[in-house]
């Protein structure tokens, strides 16, 4: 039963984050929430390591500031005890030029006393950076002209 409840809690939190209800999402997190999303923060400033509601609020707000539309599709979700893993396909529309970025991510949620206490996120950052910069980094790194 705890598994199905935590599964639904994650889906509710994701719905709130993607809809822009950041305060509603944060209310479902512990005060000392720990969010880890390894990535080059010079290009993806909302990624990295964030501790506490204030830092996570700033992270989620940065994502909304950069994108005019956000949505996701759940590819898979697994819950066991106080942990939930979810595989998402994410679609973000850049506010600057209307281009749509699409990528897959895996997120791992830990719960304490019914609230999210930790989120670990894994993304193919090479692909995401290419989409953010709108450049073929493979060609650049290999010395080939970009297509």
Model-derived regions, located:
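Short, low-complexity N-terminal intrinsically disordered segments enriched in polar/charged residues
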Residues: 1-31, 137-147
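A beta-strand edge to alpha-helix "cap/lid" segment located at domain peripheries
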Residues: 1-5, 64-147
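A solvent-exposed, acidic/Ser-Thr-rich amphipathic alpha-helical stretch
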Residues: 5, 24, 30-81
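Hydrophobic alpha-helical core bundles mediating ligand binding, dimerization, or RNAP-core interactions
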Residues: 10, 14-17, 29, 37, ...
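Hydrophobic pocket/interface hotspot
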Residues: 10-13, 25-26, 33, 52, ...
């Amino acid at each position: 039963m705890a598994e199905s409840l935590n599964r639904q809690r994650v889906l509710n939190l994701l719905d709130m984050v993607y809809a822009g209800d950041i305060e509603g999402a944060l209310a479902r997190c512990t005060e000392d929430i720990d969010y880890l999303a390894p990535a080059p923060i010079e290009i993806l400033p909302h990624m990295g390591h964030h501790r506490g509601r204030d830092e996570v609020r700033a992270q989620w707000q940065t994502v909304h500031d950069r994108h005019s539309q956000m949505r996701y599709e759940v590819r898979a979700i697994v819950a066991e005890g106080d942990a939930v893993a979810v595989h998402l396909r994410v679609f973000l529309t850049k506010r600057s030029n209307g281009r749509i970025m699409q990528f897959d991510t895996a997120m791992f949620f830990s719960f304490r006393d019914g609230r999210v206490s930790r989120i670990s996120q894994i993304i193919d950052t090479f692909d995401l950076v290419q989409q953010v910069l709108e450049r073929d980094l493979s060609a650049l790194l290999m010395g080939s002209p970009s297509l």
